[in-house]
From Swiss-Prot:
Family: Belongs to the major facilitator superfamily. CAR1 family.
Name of protein: Quinidine resistance protein 1
GO MF term list: efflux transmembrane transporter activity; transmembrane transporter activity
Originating organism: Saccharomyces cerevisiae (strain ATCC 204508 / S288c)
Spans traversing the lipid bilayer: 76-96, 109-129, 136-156, 166-186, 196-216, 225-245, 297-317, 342-362, 422-442, 446-466, 482-502, 512-532
Matches recorded under CDD domains: MFS_Tpo1_MDR_like
Signal sequence, start to end: none
Gene3D superfamilies in alphabetical order: MFS general substrate transporter like domains
Function: Multidrug resistance transporter involved in resistance and adaptation to quinidine and ketoconazole.
Residue numbers spanned by region Disordered: 1-50
Biased composition (Polar residues): 1-10
Chief location bin: membrane
InterPro entries per record: MFS, MFS_dom, MFS_trans_sf
Length: 563
């Protein structure tokens, strides 16, 4: 049987979700962008094929639904240790303050430095993952984190705590950005929102319930127990990742069917018969390999040079930093105003944790539904437009294709599909945070504090799912680098707000602080209207500029289809 015959037979079993929203007679209008002239990640901005490569009869990804779900579990497991390391520390903040005889501001610095390194590291390591592959960078990250946690568990002074918190954050934080890259490697736009939502949802379990875990461990065995817990857990994660995590970077493995050359990128799971059969490792699709790119440490700056991306990152960053400031304030207030024990403080994070988990997973599922619905309507509309143009130009297909390719009016509005519900969620969370601030300021009953915290958390992190999914859509081959920029914004803004929290409370009280933060966040959300109105045109113009600078005719070249 020839390779062509085998390919035809394989395509008879392509999953329905990998065909949904596609139409081989039309051309995609995804607002994807390249961050440099030589980047091969430009999408074919005018192909109706949302989910497959340019090569006929070859699926975009060989990973089955079950294998994608296993990747979700793998990403969530590693991502959990990145998110939990921040929140698990909150219940012992006042204990650290007393243990090392430091001020509240110095205790907050241990959180600030964590966020600084959590923001900076992914911007660097994400670029390495986009070049050398996801697997080796993830393994290095877990190993560095594992060593830092052991050091923290054995620390004897404040300086050691501070330095090792920096290493801990720098080590593990890149996995959040890399996880987005992994999902971009193996999923299509029509299904991506759900998978990204699942990964983000399970990752946020660490943030949502870390304080509860930390309170339970520290109240039973002392503050060092939280770091021993992280060391043991990350050690187990390192073993499983070494054995089971496959490489997904499309420059190295294509659609998953190509065996990577370097042993660092090869997992033992590739030797399992069922995996070899599903991925077609014995009958690969080398044509799906994307061109290799060199390491570009300036890639984040190129992404940050894009106006609409800056707006999106600012909005998401301000929202996340308000949420993390609320967590820090909750810890301090429950300990010093409400005089609760460490164990009870942990329990008080449960309502916000459940709300956060619910919101992120629900947001991902909503994005899938929204994308499919809008894409179906768009498909009908563009077919009608093509028929009208064919009549107008008397059946000149080339003329019609050129007109559609060169006019943004006919482009699918991916920005609107991903961001249209964001304004409502941002507004509701701002109301919740304002109410939370005044509740703790006047010391209302604890139930009111926890209810406002839960309400604000229910809507505050939706923007992370929306923005992460859109960023992966726009930069499928640089997803780790692009998502690292999101981490940079949200973590550095969090560091600034938390560092200033004590001083702001002295001047404005908690009510004034959260009214101020909510006002900034809700004001920034007005920029969403600019994105929703102009995002499609801005992305379209940027693609034209990049194509012209590379000497290509817009939409008429064999560029890679955005996933």
């Amino acid at each position: 049987m020839t390779k062509q015959q085998t390919s035809v037979m394989r395509n008879a079993s392509i999953a329905k979700e990998e065909r949904e929203g596609s139409d081989n007679n039309n051309v995609d209008r995804s607002s994807s962008d390249a961050i440099s002239d030589n980047d091969a990640e430009r999408s074919n901005s005018h192909s109706e094929i949302d989910n497959e490569s340019n090569f006929d009869m070859v699926p975009y990804s060989r990973f089955s639904h079950k294998q994608k779900m296993l990747l979700v579990v793998q990403c969530a497991f590693t991502g959990f240790f990145s998110t939990v390391a921040g929140s698990i520390y909150y219940p012992v903040l006042t204990i650290i303050e007393r243990k090392f005889n430091i001020t509240e501001e110095l205790a907050n610095v241990t959180i600030v430095v964590y966020f600084i390194f959590q923001g900076v590291a992914p911007s660097i390591m994400g670029g390495l993952a986009d070049t050398f592959g996801r697997r080796p960078i993830v393994l290095w990250a877990i190993l560095a984190y594992f060593c830092a946690c052991i050091g923290l568990a054995c620390a004897h002074n404040y300086a050691q705590i501070l330095a090792l918190r920096c290493l801990q954050a720098a080590g593990i934080s890149p996995v959040i950005a890399i996880n987005s890259g992994i999902m971009g490697d193996v999923t299509t736009k029509v299904e991506r929102g759900g998978y990204v939502g699942l990964v983000a949802g399970f990752q946020v379990v660490g943030t949502a319930f870390g304080a509860l875990i930390g309170a339970g461990l520290s109240s039973k065995w002392g503050w060092r127990a939280i770091f021993w817990f992280l060391a043991i857990g990350s050690g187990i994660c390192l073993v499983f990742s070494t054995l089971l995590m496959p490489e997904t970077k499309r420059t190295l493995v294509g659609n998953g069917s190509v065996t990577p050359r370097s042993f660092l990128n090869r997992s033992l799971i590739l030797h399992v018969g069922s995996v070899k059969k599903t991925l077609h490792l014995d009958d690969p699709d080398p044509e799906t390999l994307e061109p290799r790119t060199s390491v570009d440490f300036l890639a984040p700056l190129k992404i940050l040079h894009i106006r609409e991306i800056d707006i999106l990152l600012s909005i998401a960053g301000l929202q996340f930093s308000t949420w993390t400031t609320h967590q820090t304030a909750l810890t301090i207030v429950l300990s010093k105003k409400y005089n609760l024990s460490v164990a009870k403080i942990g329990l008080c994070f449960l309502p916000a944790g459940i709300s956060t988990l619910t919101s992120i997973i629900s947001a991902g599922r909503y994005l899938n539904w929204s994308y499919r619905t809008r894409k179906v309507k768009y498909n009908r509309w563009i077919k009608e437009q093509e028929l009208q143009l064919m009549e107008k130009y008397k059946g000149d297909k080339n003329k019609v294709a050129e007109l559609i390719h060169s006019n943004s009016h006919y482009a699918f509005n991916l920005v609107e599909a991903r961001l249209h519900p964001a304004f409502v969620t941002l507004l509701l969370s701002s109301i919740g945070f304002t109410a939370f601030g005044w509740c703790i300021s006047v010391k209302t009953p604890l139930a009111a504090v926890l209810c406002t915290s839960a309400f604000a958390s229910l809507f505050s992190n939706c923007i992370l799912t929306f923005s992460t999914t859109l960023i992966v859509d726009l930069f499928p081959s640089k997803a780790s680098t692009a998502t690292g920029c999101l981490n940079l914004f949200r973590c550095l803004l969090s560091a600034i707000f938390i560092a200033a929290l004590t001083k702001m409370v002295e001047k404005m009280r908690y009510g004034g602080v959260f009214t101020f933060l909510s006002a900034i966040t809700s004001s920034s959300s007005l920029l969403l209207f600019y994105l929703l109105k102009n995002g499609k045109q801005l992305s379209f113009d940027r693609i034209r500029a990049n194509d012209k600078s590379a000497g290509r005719s817009v939409g008429k070249n064999s560029e890679k289809v955005s996933t």
